[in-house]
């Protein structure tokens, strides 16, 4: 059977179009996955640069200045160096637990970003239990730290892992009533609904003014969850060498630092969402979208404004934990546990009781 040349060309063009469709489908499948990862990575690099510059200013010294303009690429250079360092394994440790621990710590924190709204309808998963899903996911990270400490077969590492687990439990409990109080005020546990509830009265509608006690407790608890000074007892250098990180080197050691800064950024973003109005500017800016002919809550321009406002609030809030790290001394372990169980927990429960009573009286 003789096939015409035109038919052959048509078949070839059809096969090419089908292969192109498969390639496009694969690209569009990977874009939603790698775009948030790329954004989070850039956010962590910015935090590292900010911390180095702020700490240099506090200590009256010069920060990083050689790697890129103003030293902004120094964190990228350090990460690249860690990639090529030797990955040492403890000879008498549990290799499986030792290797899995850092991954659990990083992945559990990355999952928290799925419920954070960066703009109007710009959230990976708008769940009705968004804030409580974050609390549940964040409680998985200490398991990875405990596995790392136990798998290292080192007394300093194991003590650091135990401290991390005890500290996380002690400050997760007072943090939960603060989040529950916000949910009662907003009549929802969805992060998007909580931001929308704060947009009704502009700047005065922020939960920061309606829940000042809860905000302070949430701030202290989130700093303890991030293991930042004065709450960095799981990795206290003078006592435990480096805590659960003592036996780690190379990329696995870098994963712990990434997890620390990821957790810090997550806490700042949740402070922005729960207490600082989220993506809402809280200042009338209707003339800006009208000037460009774009709706305030829709379109590329409105989405970009929402992302910028959310990140600006989060990074401005980051000055508090960065400054406290370089100004306050470390607490003792008994002081840390007493602060969580005997001070913050009763205050957070009392704040929840007051919030519940006010909501019942307003019905």
Curated annotation (Swiss-Prot):
GO terms for cellular component: chloroplast thylakoid membrane. Keywords: Chloroplast, Membrane, NAD, NADP, Plastid, Plastoquinone, Quinone, Thylakoid, Translocase, Transmembrane, Transmembrane helix. It comes from the Eukaryota. InterPro entries: NADH_UbQ_OxRdtase_su1/FPO, NADH_UbQ_OxRdtase_su1_CS. Its EC number is 7.1.1.-. GO terms for biological process: aerobic respiration; photosynthesis, light reaction. It is found in: Plastid, Chloroplast thylakoid membrane. The chain crosses the membrane at residues 27-47, 98-118, 127-147, 255-277, 300-320, 336-356. It holds the Pfam family NADHdh. One of its GO terms (molecular function) is oxidoreductase activity, acting on NAD(P)H, quinone or similar compound as acceptor. It is a multi-pass membrane protein. The keyword rRNA processing does not apply. It is an enzyme of class 7 (translocase). Its main location: plastid. It catalyses: a plastoquinone + NADH + (n+1) H(+)(in) = a plastoquinol + NAD(+) + n H(+)(out); a plastoquinone + NADPH + (n+1) H(+)(in) = a plastoquinol + NADP(+) + n H(+)(out). NDH shuttles electrons from NAD(P)H:plastoquinone, via FMN and iron-sulfur (Fe-S) centers, to quinones in the photosynthetic chain and possibly in a chloroplast respiratory chain. The immediate electron acceptor for the enzyme in this species is believed to be plastoquinone. Couples the redox reaction to proton translocation, and thus conserves the redox energy in a proton gradient. NDH is composed of at least 16 different subunits, 5 of which are encoded in the nucleus. Belongs to the complex I subunit 1 family. This is NAD(P)H-quinone oxidoreductase subunit 1, chloroplastic. It comes from Liriodendron tulipifera (Tuliptree).
């Amino acid at each position: 059977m003789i096939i015409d040349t035109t038919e052959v060309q048509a078949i070839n063009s059809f096969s090419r179009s089908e292969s192109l469709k498969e390639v496009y489908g694969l690209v569009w499948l990977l874009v939603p996955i790698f775009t948030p990862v790329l954004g989070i990575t850039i956010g962590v690099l910015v935090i590292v640069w900010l911390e180095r510059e702020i700490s240099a200013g506090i200590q009256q010294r010069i920060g990083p200045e050689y790697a890129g303009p103003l030293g902004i690429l120094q964190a990228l250079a350090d990460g690249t160096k860690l990639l090529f360092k030797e990955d040492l394994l403890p000879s008498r440790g549990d290799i499986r637990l030792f290797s899995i621990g850092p991954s659990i710590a990083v992945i559990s924190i990355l999952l928290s970003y799925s419920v954070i709204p960066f703009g109007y309808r710009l959230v990976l998963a708008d769940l009705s239990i968004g804030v409580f899903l974050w609390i549940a996911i964040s409680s998985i990270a200490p398991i990875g730290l405990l596995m790392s400490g136990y798998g290292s077969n080192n007394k300093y590492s194991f003590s650091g892992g135990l401290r991390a687990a005890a500290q996380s439990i002690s400050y997760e409990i007072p943090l939960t009533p603060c989040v529950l109080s916000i949910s009662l005020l907003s009549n929802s546990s969805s992060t998007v609904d909580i931001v929308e509830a704060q947009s009704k009265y502009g700047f005065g509608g922020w939960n920061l003014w309606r829940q000042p006690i809860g905000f302070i407790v949430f701030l202290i608890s989130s700093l303890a969850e991030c293991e930042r000074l004065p709450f960095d007892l799981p990795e206290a250098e003078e006592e435990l060498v480096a805590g659960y990180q003592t036996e780690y080197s190379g990329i696995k050691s870098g994963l712990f630092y990434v997890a620390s800064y990821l957790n810090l950024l997550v806490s700042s973003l949740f402070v922005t969402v729960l207490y600082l109005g989220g993506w809402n500017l809280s200042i009338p800016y209707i003339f800006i979208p009208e000037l460009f002919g774009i709706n305030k809550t829709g379109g590329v321009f409105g989405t970009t404004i929402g992302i910028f406002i959310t990140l600006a609030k989060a990074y401005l809030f980051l000055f508090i934990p960065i400054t406290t790290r370089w100004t306050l001394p470390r607490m003792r372990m008994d002081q840390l546990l007493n602060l969580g169980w005997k001070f913050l927990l009763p205050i957070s429960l009392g704040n929840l009781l007051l919030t519940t009573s006010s909501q019942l009286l307003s019905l």
